[in-house]
Amino acid sequence: MLLPKYKTYTVQDIYDLPEGTRAELIDGTMYMMAPPSRAHQEIVGEIFAVIRDYIKQKGGVCRPYVAPFAVFLNEDDHIYVEPDVSVICDPSKLNDKGCA
């Protein structure tokens, strides 16, 4: 029996997925993501609001973002994650696709 050849995926493979399909990429392995439930979205919304309000109250310069919002770690083409909530404190790292 032949085993399928292991493929190392890149960020471009994520971009080539059909519209609305979500996945994350860890060390070249693609992990498909199920659509979030309503309860999940409510919890994420509450977490986002608490973080946003705290930053505003403290006069911080950081900004919170909710998924889908890509975070590129170490400029590695084999890592692409979409955390439920991200806090970005360096606006120079933001681009049209997320945070690099």
What are these regions (language model features)?
Residues 1-100:
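Gly/Pro/Ser/Thr-rich low-complexity, intrinsically disordered segments predominantly at protein N-termini
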